[in-house]
Each structure stands twice: as C-alpha cells, then as structure tokens.
C-alpha cells in the first residue's frame, strides 16, 4: 500500500504487525484434542547424531518450565553415557577410560525434576560395543556396576528418581536380547525396590534405513512377523520390564494403526504398559534431523489414542519441540501443538 494511501486512511503500518499477545490461532479444519498428549520426553544430553545445544542449568531450568506447561510429567535421560562421554562423575566409568564431565547432569536433572514435580528415569550406559558387534554382553557387564553406583549415589537421595530406561535399542529378536534385557531389568528393579523399567525399540519398517544412504527400504518387517518376534521377546522380559515405548517413526503413516494395534495387544497379553515414543523429528527429510511437520506428529498421536496406548513420550522435546531450541521450527511446533490440544 502506498504511503499516501496509508496516511489518507489515518493508519500506521505498525497496526498490521501482530504482537505475540494478539497472535491469531490457526483455524484448524480437523477436530482438536483428538490425540494422545505427550507427557514424557527423553533428555538427549549425550548427543549421538544431533548437534549439542551447550545449555547450562539456566537454560535447562527454563526448558523444564516449557515442558511443564504442556503437561510433561516424566523426563528420561536417554543414556548416562555413550562410549567415552558420560553424564556424571562415575568412578567406575572414569576408571574404564571415560572422560570427566564438567557438570554432574544426573544430579542437575534430578533436582530440576524435583523442583517441577516430575519423575526422572535413568538411562543406562551405552558402551558402543553393541552397535559395533551386535554383542550385548558388554552392555550387561558395564551396567552391572553403573546401576549399583547410580542408585547408591542418587537413588536414595532424590524422591524424583522414578525409574529406569534400558537404553539398548533393538527392532527384532536379536540374539541375546531377551537375556540381556532380563538381566539388566531385574538388577534395576532389585536394587531400587521395584521401580519401573522400560525399553524403547524401533519397528523394523520401511524407514529403518540408518547408514544406507536411502530414504526407504523394500525388505521391511511385516505386521505378522513383528507380532511373532515381539511376542517371544515380551514373553521373556515382561516380569522385569514394565513398559515398552516403540519408536513410531520407522513406519509409514498409513501403517500406524496396524502396528499400533498389535503392540497394544501384545502389551496387554503380558501385563505391560504400551507407550508410544512419538518422534518429534522428521525421518522423511534428507537432512538428519529437523523438527517434524505438525500434521505428521498429529497423525501419530491420534493413532496412539485410537489404539488405546497408555502414555506418549517423545524423542525429544529440547531439540525438536522447545521454544528455545536451536531450531526455529521447534518453537512453531510447540505453538501448533498447544493450539491443537487447547493448552493456554
């Protein structure tokens, strides 16, 4: 509009710029609040393939406030260490050649969880040997010491210490997986007087292509084979693993209902809780990894609700859903999520 016309109408250009307090909500043409709300998130501080945000306690405190605002009550440290990088000054792991961290992140997360009335799940140590060799014996051996050390140092000190995450990830009935999960799960429960444990495997679907340079694959697992293999796994671990949160990003959106129905049926059969790990990053992009398009997240959460899942957690809030993420799109996703779930 020409300046003379603006002046003639007695208007100032600033009137056309909305402040955040006056921002107009999106006019959704789908039903609102029709999915399973995210109530838990992983904390990806030992980053494997995502850039580190270099936050201090001030930034983490603010992020916990953002989490609390949308109803997150559970935070899960995805791993307490990966190869030589660790999250707390573990005497055992330092003795094995790991690097000394500058901050005790386990203590910080437990304090923040206590401050904001959340439960903290401790993720076990990842040696890296399993990814190199597919041999799980290293994970069992190292975590024998880590589990005891962590419980003695933090478990009895903080009421926010709410459970354990067995961080080894599988998708199929990998050799030795049942025994390894059972051993680690049992030790976690024994040492902590029965605190809950969970796993978060991936579904070996068409998007399970890490390391191949491709976007999809042809030899994806069928729903029937997935059911057979996970029936066997659950049969062997259900007495020491309380919940299973399948990652939801490796299958296509029109496959969600079929796989989710099977997952819930198996969990119910073995008395386990069925969670979804709703990935808030986008596997359909050639760039690893950026915040997901809102409609993709919406469809996944709606499928989880249709299947009757017990809880939705995400990987992960701080990079892909937080208003203070290094990715600008994450804050916009936070806004779209709040609009959809009618969170003020």
Where are the regions a protein language model picked out?
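N-terminal twin-arginine translocation
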Residues: 2-22
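Glycan-processing catalytic domains of CAZymes
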Residues: 16-344
């Amino acid at each position: 509009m020409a300046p003379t016309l603006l002046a003639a109408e007695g208007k100032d250009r600033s009137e056309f710029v909305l402040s955040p307090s006056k921002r107009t909500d999106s006019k959704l043409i789908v039903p609102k609040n029709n999915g399973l709300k995210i109530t838990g998130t992983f904390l990806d501080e030992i980053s494997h393939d995502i850039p580190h945000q270099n936050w201090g306690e001030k930034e983490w405190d603010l992020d916990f406030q953002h989490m609390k605002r949308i109803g997150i009550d559970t935070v899960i440290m995805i791993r307490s260490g990966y190869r030589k990088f660790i999250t707390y000054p573990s005497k055992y792991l330092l003795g094995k050649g790991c690097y000394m961290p500058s901050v005790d992140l386990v203590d910080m997360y437990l304090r923040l969880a206590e401050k904001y009335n959340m439960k903290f799940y401790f993720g076990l140590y990842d040696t890296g040997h399993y990814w190199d060799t597919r041999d799980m014996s290293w994970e069992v051996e190292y975590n024998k010491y880590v589990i005891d050390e962590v419980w003695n140092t933090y478990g009895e000190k903080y009421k926010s210490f709410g459970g354990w995450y067995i961080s080894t990830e599988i998708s199929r009935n990998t050799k030795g997986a049942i025994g390894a999960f059972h051993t680690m799960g049992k030790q976690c429960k024994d040492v902590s007087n029965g605190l809950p444990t969970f796993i978060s495997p991936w579904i070996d679907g068409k998007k399970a292509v890490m390391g191949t340079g491709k976007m999809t694959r042809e030899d994806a697992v069928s729903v029937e084979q997935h059911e057979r293999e996970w029936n066997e796994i659950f049969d062997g671990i259900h007495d020491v693993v309380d919940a299973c949160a399948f990652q939801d990003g490796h299958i296509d959106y029109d496959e969600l209902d079929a796989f989710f129905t099977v997952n819930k049926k198996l969990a119910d059969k073995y008395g386990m809780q069925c969670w979804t790990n709703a990935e808030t990053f986008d596997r359909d992009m050639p760039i690893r990894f950026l915040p997901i398009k809102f409609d993709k997240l919406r469809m996944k959460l709606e499928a989880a609700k249709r299947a009757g899942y017990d809880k939705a957690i995400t990987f992960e809030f701080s990079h892909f859903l937080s208003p203070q993420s290094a990715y600008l799109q994450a804050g916009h996703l936070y806004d779209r999520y709040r609009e959809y779930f009618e969170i003020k």
